[in-house]
């Protein structure tokens, strides 16, 4: 059975009081291991989601580490709410690198009308300077990522049309087609209410290893795992019945949104997967999985 092992019982990244934009929470981070370093693009807020004053706005910060645990960070965000679609912020980024370019999908939250959240895309050559490419799908949608390489010459995206995980294909990153659901909630289980992806899929010899999040009827968020076919990733070839990580530590159970472990990023170094996750929508933790232990 696949289980994640926490590298630390403490968060690896916490809010920073002296930086106003990230003084309340840091969570739900993208992650990638590249050029010998662990890179995070993390979501941060200046107030809590239930604050009686001000607006809850998410921005994206950057942190870097040599060992995956001890991080240095920039004092200013790398992306802030600068467009109409981002009036209330940029949420839950996920990053892949294809042909030397970093592609980041994130949720732009406009809050101009009901369900005003959209998948957005930005690109970068250095993880610091980002160029917005705009809205990917003009519909209420979130939890999206590209696969880290083209499959059969096409870009492939996972996204979330509530309450399922969907897949879609594109030739140009603008026009998406062949949308279909690939993973659905299972009634009366830990994944009964909704499912959505964690970080981008990871290529293994047996298939695309995908970590996903799921909520139950009590809004407890856990992480699960599936394996997708290498050539046709719309096919789920294995799905573990049990979660691979669930809220157990104090900072996973208590925070702005209690009982949540929620991942947006995996950093693969050698044969170890570092899974970064938000704890209770307040701090960031990390757990690992050895590639050899991916056994369904």
From Swiss-Prot:
A Pfam entry, by short name: Glyco_hydro_130
Enzyme class, UniProt record, top EC level: transferase
Reactions catalysed, as given in the entry: [(1->2)-beta-D-mannosyl](n) + phosphate = [(1->2)-beta-D-mannosyl](n-1) + alpha-D-mannose 1-phosphate
Annotated GO biological process: GDP-mannose biosynthetic process
Summary of pH dependence: Optimum pH is 6.0 for phosphorolytic activity. Optimum pH is 5.0 for the synthetic reaction.
EC nos: 2.4.1.340
Subunit structure: Homodimer.
Function: Probably involved in a salvage pathway for GDP-D-mannose biosynthesis. Catalyzes the reversible phosphorolysis of 1,2-beta-oligomannan. In phosphorolytic reactions, prefers 1,2-beta-oligomannan with a degree of polymerization (DP) of 3, 4 and 5. Produces alpha-D-mannose 1-phosphate, which is the precursor of GDP-D-mannose.
Protein family according to the UniProt entry: Belongs to the glycosyl hydrolase 130 family.
Protein name: 1,2-beta-oligomannan phosphorylase
Biological source species: Thermoanaerobacter sp. (strain X514)
Biological classification of the source: Bacteria, Bacillati, Bacillota, Clostridia, Thermoanaerobacterales
